[in-house]
Amino acid sequence: MVSGLGVPAAIGKACEGRRLDPGVERVLFTLVANRALAPASKLAALEWAACDVHLPGVEDLGSDPQVFYRAMDFLLEADTAVQEHVFFAVANLLNIQVDVLLFDTTSTYFETEDDDGFRRYGKSKDHRPDRPQTVIGLAVTREGIPVRVWSWPGNAADTVVIRQVHDELRDWSLHRVLWVGDRGFASEQNRVHLQRAGGQVLFAEKLRGVSDNAAALARPGRYAVVTDSLHVKEVWVGDGASRRRFIIARNLSEAARDAATRGRHLERLKTELNALAGKSGDARLAAEGALLAHPVLRRYLVRRKGRLVIDTAADAAQLYKGLLDVERSFRDLKQVLELRPVYHRLEQRIRAHITLCYLALMLIRVAENATGLTWPVIARTMDRMHAGEFTGPAGRVTQRTETTSDQRAILRALHIPEPAILLDHDLSTQVTTAAQRSA
């Protein structure tokens, strides 16, 4: 699969002009495969490669994890080139059109209290403000294929990092791109920056607190039906150069949940108000006003009902929901690929580790898109294919188990030929007979 996607060639191209061991691609492949199949430390990955899997070309890695660290150092030096070459190799093969980029950030924390410049305290999206962290950014296509990954010190702000992301991807010549992001990126400076050279943006907006948003919400108009649960309408606010287009999206499923939640809070309000029945006059009015001004309860007494205001350029409602693919990618990075714990202290190794996880994520997304199966199902199914080594008087032979129908379907969907039954031998036809006798 890796070869079919052109990853070795892409890494080889990034290696051009560098004095490197020609086996660096195999070493990086081992690290990516380990991350996708059995995430472990670099030292444990050596044992995994030697004892648990059949990986041609990586038999002589030895027992020193420095072989991995040297490859990771190269990966960091050529990070941008490797990611660019790998992505375009995948995009060309799968005919992916990069006209929409969905971007979001997450964080991963470290089991230490040291704040050392890259591992910094900041706003934790893992709900661990007591630990230093690193911020990770991910750009994803509308098909869910990751385009590129970034990492920043743990105190980096969303409003700043997206400008760096835009500037770096501009060098990739992706033509005209629609940027989709959450409301944390929706500053006026970011809009102006991203719309340079004809770019477009689709950002979420706060329901309240911004005059244009309030004006958009108050504007009458009919909703168009996108799906059974999603209705949208278009609203224009402002004049001249400041004129902005909004899409008011009404999610009926969320509106129903909001109504149920609002009902529970109203019941609580009624209970609280009934408790004030003994009060009268100004005291009662003051108590009621305090309840109705409650920062949590009062929001269920104003215009909400599942409506979301987003600033857009095209295909707004459906594209914004595509941010769920980015969130899913972050979950897979942390849970399936086990981004944490990070066993590295140096900034360059942490960055390289994150890039390795990105490469593994790209491979599993391609596999999922091609097969229609989740990666855990694919991995479990293919893990049932085993290789056995048989020895006898005539020599040695390594042979795999028969391919099951489920395995064959996965290989066919990925356009991968079935591996040879006989994986390795030393005395050709005589060994087969000897192996059969020893079995």
What is each stretch, according to the model?
Residues 9-439:
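Anion-binding and metal-coordination hotspots
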Residues 1-2:
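Short, compositionally biased segments
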